C-alpha cells in the first residue's frame, strides 16, 4: 500500500514486480531524453535541473539495459537530423519512432522478441503519425516541422482519407502481432485499448 499525493487521506494498493520496474525504467529513459531535448531547445534551467536529478538513475538503467538506452539515444539523434533536414519521407520519419519503441517493448531476447519488436514498431509509427496529425494545423500556422504538411500540399482532397487509412494500417499490423502473443492476464482490457482507445484523439 502507498499514499497518493493527490489523495493523501486514502491508502492505495499497487502491484509491483520485475515487469513494472522495467516499465518504470523505460519511462525514466524517455523522460530524461525529452528533458534533455527541451533543455537544448529552450535553454530552460528548470529542465536542466530535472536532468541532473535523474542523472544517477539514468546511469543505473544504462548499465542494466544498454540496448534500450542506445536505441532511445539513437532515436533522439536521428529525429533531430530529419527535422533539421526537413525530411518529407513520412515512412522513414515515422519508422524512427517505430524502431525505438520496438527495442523498448523487447524486454528480453527470447522466443517472443521478434513479435514484440514488430508490435512496438507499428505502435511507434502509429503514435508518431497520430501526433503529427493532431499537431498538423498548429504546426502549419507556426511553420514548424511536420511531414504531413508536404503530403497535404500534394493531395489536399484525399489528405484526411489517406491519414485515416495509414493509421488504420499501422494499428492493424500492431493488433496482428498482439494476437500472436501469449497474453492471458488483462487481454480484454489491452484489446479494448488497441481496437478502440487509441482512436480517441483522432475522433
Give residue spans per PLM region.
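Acidic catalytic motifs of isoprenoid enzymes
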Residues: 1-118, 125, 129-168, 176-189, ...
